[in-house]
């Protein structure tokens, strides 16, 4: 199987899906690997480093000729022309956010494996490290954009406690998963007050126990509680993600209108559509805009701003799956590995993820009923 590592085209994206170390694992197993020129530069990996591990450096067009194309994010629209029948595309594809790319993949007969939908032992194994990074960074961005020169309220999130008692900011975090706890931990490190809004009762108890000795309040998620708590936010971070599906707009425009002027609103799951009615995707170079008097931060690829760390984390997580696909062939790997099967969103043009099918009103078939 010919494996290609392509350079990301998404604005500001510095990650690469495969490290030189992982290229060596593939070539040692007898697989041919091609790497697009400068694919790893943003993460600190030179072309020479890949060549020393057995890869061949190729052009963008040549990389897309591979049987298995390994990416970080979804293909850019300019890359749709390279799709070919039975090609496998691997990455954090977030297909629920774009019906256009899904229809193109169906038309050509592509197989799409989305790392964010791979579930192992009930957890999003590959997404978790990226969620942790996005959560931590969101808390930092909330502090940054709270400053007056960035359009914020002009508040120092830490407060001041030397001979005076000026309280720090309040972070309201919607959702209680990996991204949420990482955001909360950074906010607490900044001496901020934290309110977490979570739906699941068992998770609420877990969070209450985790933060029993911290300045954290955990609130049951209801529309009424959300509307009440968002008014308190100096920084509001939504972390809600439904694997494979587009989430509902739970944070309404009216709720955003009720927020403090100059407060900061961040949606970590904007790459899947987001849960905030007023949010839209932004870029790393142009990350914020103001609407209803609130600063909106909608960067969909936050881990891409710290590519060295993020690349090491994602590459460590995905290599075993990629090796299994290359060693066994995709069909056998799917049969042998239940977690891998949950990542197959489209198989040779057929949608095989229920959430994705529902998001775009498309026909769905169970993956094991589709493969030969």
PLM features: residue spans?
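Short, ordered loop/turn segments at secondary-structure junctions
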Residues: 8-10, 38-40, 74, 94-95, ...
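Generic hydrophobic/aromatic pocket-lining and core-packing "Φ" positions
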Residues: 23, 47, 102, 139, ...
């Amino acid at each position: 199987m010919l494996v290609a590592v392509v350079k990301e085209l998404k604005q500001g994206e510095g990650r690469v899906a495969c490290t030189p170390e992982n290229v060596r694992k593939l070539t040692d197993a007898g697989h041919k690997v091609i790497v697009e020129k400068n694919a790893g530069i943003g993460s600190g990996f030179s072309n020479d480093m890949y060549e020393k591990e057995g890869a061949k450096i190729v052009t963008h067009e040549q990389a897309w000729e591979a049987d298995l194309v390994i990416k970080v994010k979804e293909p850019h629209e300019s890359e749709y022309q390279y799709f070919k029948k039975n090609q496998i595309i691997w990455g954090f594809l977030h297909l629920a956010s774009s019906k256009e790319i899904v229809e193109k993949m169906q038309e050509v007969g592509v197989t799409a494996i989305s790392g964010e939908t791979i579930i192992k032992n009930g957890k999003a194994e590959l997404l978790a490290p990226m969620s942790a990074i996005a959560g931590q960074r969101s808390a930092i961005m909330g502090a940054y954009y709270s400053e007056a020169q960035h359009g914020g309220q002009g508040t120092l999130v830490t407060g001041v406690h030397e001979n005076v008692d000026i309280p720090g900011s309040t972070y309201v975090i919607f959702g209680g998963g990996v991204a949420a706890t990482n955001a909360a931990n950074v906010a607490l490190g900044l001496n901020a007050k934290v309110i977490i809004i979570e739906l699941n009762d068992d998770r609420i108890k877990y969070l209450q126990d985790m933060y029993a000795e911290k300045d954290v309040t955990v609130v049951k998620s209801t529309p009424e509680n959300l509307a009440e708590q968002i008014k308190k936010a100096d920084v509001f971070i939504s972390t809600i993600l439904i694997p494979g599906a587009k989430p509902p707009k739970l944070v309404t425009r009216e709720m955003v209108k009720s927020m403090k002027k100059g407060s900061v609103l961040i949606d970590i799951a904007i790459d899947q559509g987001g849960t905030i009615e007023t949010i839209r995707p932004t870029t790393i170079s142009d990350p914020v805009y103001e609407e209803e008097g609130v600063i909106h931060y909608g960067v969909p690829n936050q881990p891409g701003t710290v590519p060295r760390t993020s690349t090491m984390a994602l590459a460590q997580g995905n290599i075993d799956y990629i090796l299994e696909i290359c060693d066994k062939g995709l069909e056998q790997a799917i049969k042998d590995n239940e977690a891998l099967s949950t990542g197959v969103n489209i198989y040779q043009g057929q949608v095989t993820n229920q959430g994705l099918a529902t998001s775009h009103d498309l026909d769905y078939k169970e993956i094991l009923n589709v493969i030969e």
